[in-house]
Amino acid sequence: VEGVTMEEMLRAARTAARIASSGKAGKSVGLTEKTITKSRYAVTEPWEDVSVKAKIPYLEKLNEKIFSLDNRVRKVQASLSDSTSHVLFCNSEGVSYYDYRPMVSFMAVCIMEENGKMENGYAGRSYRKGFEFMTDDIVDIIAREAVDKTAILFKAVKPKGGEMPVVMGAGGSGILLHEAIGHAFEADFNRKRTSLFCDLL
């Protein structure tokens, strides 16, 4: 589809339907110009109306704030990205829905040095909000978090090697288990006999 007018989208839908049906007769759906629109995100300053020049000061503030929090900071990598999506859903009942989706990601990587040892930490926030998201408070939150995450790494010690019991709580532990052994239980790996568990299932 090279355009987003109703006529162009209907033409694309008909083409897709012909391909999917492979010549078989299917049920026709009549789409109307009526589209249901709901404001799901309370945006007061759309990103489309914000210039690059207006965004740069927040990157500069974040950079300066991180350097001011700890004299061990050697480098800061700050980034700000925004996007806006206009999505149109059409269902088999002939009803269409329009969705406006703003997105902003504001983040920083802090690199620190202590006694010749370098560490880095990351912090950021992503929201479906407009430019109103950019405040001095969010700058302070991200800066402090990036510095704290980096500073604590200098206190880290290497764990002992070998087998040991692991105690996991509810929540993210499921992801840890999946990444540790879950993939090896998947059918493809056992069918191809590339899994350690292929003879145990």
Q: For each predicted feature, which ranges?
A:
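Active-site bordering "gate/hinge" segments
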Residues: 1-201
